[in-house]
Amino acid sequence: VVLHPQFATNRLLYISYVKPGANGFGNLAVARARFENDRLGDVQDIFLANAPGNGTNRSSMWGGRIAFDRQGYLFVTLGDRQWPAVPDLSRHPAQDLLTHNGKTVRLHDDGRVPKDNPFVGTPHALPEIWSLGHRNAQGMAFDPATGDLWQNEHGPLGGDELNLILPKANYGWPVVGYGVHYTTGAAIHEGTMKDGMTPPAYVWVPSIGVSGLTFYTGERFSGWKGDLLAGGMRGQRLMRLRLKDRKVIADEVLIQDMGRIRDVQQGPDGYVYLAIDAQVRGKDGDPTPILRLVPVPRVS
């Protein structure tokens, strides 16, 4: 759920969800609604992905992160729907510009395609696509100082990535990467780098199951100002990443083993809030805890 940049006046918010389809298949959708008098009204879908599942794992790898940039454009991440990375890596749906599998898209706030999108007018390409070659981006944040767009995304067994997202860039999945096959441990990719494919700014090996990404801009943790905070589900950790000139120059594990971190956000009070996946606290359906981080004085 993301608020429109002018939410205070227009009361619009945006929700990504999986819209059911025929025969149990579904696709990622983004709905826009108006929140007034403690109720949602004027609910309408403004985007429905064309990201076919593989027929066996069709309920996974959806993507679904949404964010607005400074100009009011809406960005949406789409997962690869867990298509296997065989036999021809270059023909994987994440490399196909006629599907939304493994893509980032850029839209107007009403779902229209901006005329200056990088693939507008390109034959055999969906015009809303902004970037391609992703597996499953589960965190997205704009740098408030520069306007740069950053994402973290799941690798397979190993190889989670932090990427600087540029228009028309190809991030390589599954042709290049740092992960291996889940069951056999065999190599998946051609290598870690290839001409025409953008390498990650940072890699987690082993993977931590990245989820959630935000820039800290508050005053409560003054030493973190301008840094990225990234959550991990499998790794059950919160990480701090310091950037300089679009590169990661330092990293730190802030929290370890407090649960599967699904999302991390800075509150209006300047504290940091973590959404913990319910799976670690009990069976699905149990209350999902929200944790608040507050600074404490160091004890010498």
Map each language-model feature to its residues.
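Mobile, glycine-enriched helix-loop/loop "lid" segments at the mouths of ligand-binding/catalytic clefts
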Residues: 165-193
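Blade-edge beta-strand/turn elements of extracellular beta-propeller
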Residues: 33-56, 95-139, 188-205, 243-257
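Acidic, Gly/Ser/Thr-rich repeat motifs that build Ca2+-stabilized beta-propeller blades
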Residues: 2-85, 139-142, 147-155, 206-251, ...
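Repeat-solenoid scaffold signature
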Residues: 125-166
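Conserved hydrophobic/aromatic pocket- or pore-lining residues that grip, position, or stack substrates
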Residues: 66, 104, 162
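Repeated scaffold domains used in trafficking and secretory/extracellular systems
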Residues: 260-263
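Acidic/polar loop patches that form or flank catalytic/metal-binding clefts of enzymes
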Residues: 113-116, 149-152, 170-176
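A detector of repeated loop/turn-to-beta-strand junctions in beta-rich toroidal repeat architectures
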Residues: 27, 90-94, 101, 159, ...
